[in-house]
Amino acid sequence: MAKTDDREMTYRPLGRCGTKVSVFGLGGWTTFGGSVRNRAAVRGIIRAAFEAGINFYDIADVYADGEAERAMGAILRAFPRHKLVISSKLYFPCSGDINDRGLSRKHIRESVERSLKRIGTDYLDIYFCHRFDKETPLEETVRAMDDLVHQ
């Protein structure tokens, strides 16, 4: 368990990729829920989390219909990007479009691009599949995710 600076936060390896994440993270669902209400309060929460040494911030495209990604991204831009580990997720529909759901290659590529724009970053450190997609072959999902890693 590595510590950094003179903070009390503990960091652990994220798998075997070399990245370390704080043992505590800040999640978009608990922060924003189904809507983005009081941005000033959320800004204070995120600032306090960052100052406490939390470096892991998790969000999803579906939270508050994309507004949670926009709000968290706008707040996180106040901090050095290299000190953040940002994740998002996909699976659930964010529109009425028939292909805006699941884990198909098409949806993965389009969803990550929209998330990057909403969050206001060039890359995500982690991109999660929010759940298993029984309609898409696992091989297609894995290949599409691997393509993202190699971009």
Report residues per predicted region.
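N-terminal, well-ordered alpha-helical segments
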Residues: 44-47, 70-74, 88, 106, ...
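Active-site loop signature of alpha/beta-hydrolase-fold enzymes
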Residues: 62-65, 93, 134
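N-terminal binding-site loop/beta-alpha segment at the start of enzyme catalytic domains
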Residues: 1-84, 150
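N-terminal small/glycine-rich loop or linker at the start of catalytic domains
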Residues: 16-34, 87-100, 123, 128
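Glycine/proline-rich, positively charged
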Residues: 95-151
